[in-house]
């Protein structure tokens, strides 16, 4: 069995490290993006829910209630 030349091994190692770095970085960034989108969606949903509740409260306060009829 023949051995590879030292420069072939070095080139192969550098190539593997480059590919692993690119794949790992891509997965890391994709995970961070997914997390950020999820958290922003939750925050937006809470904000909209609170805003609707405030609008309903304001409508109830502004609408005059009819006096009870006997």
From Swiss-Prot:
Residues 49-70 are annotated as: Disordered. This is Cytochrome c oxidase assembly protein COX14. Keywords: Membrane, Mitochondrion, Transmembrane, Transmembrane helix. It comes from the Eukaryota. Present with 6840 molecules/cell in log phase SD medium. It is a single-pass membrane protein. InterPro entries: COX14.
């Amino acid at each position: 069995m023949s051995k590879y030349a030292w420069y072939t091994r070095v080139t192969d190692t550098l190539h593997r490290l480059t590919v692993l770095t690119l794949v790992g970085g891509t997965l890391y960034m994709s995970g961070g993006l997914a997390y950020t989108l999820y958290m922003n969606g939750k925050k937006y949903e809470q904000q909209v829910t609170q805003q609707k509740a405030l609008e309903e409260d304001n409508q109830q306060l502004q609408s005059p209630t009819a006096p009870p009829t006997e």
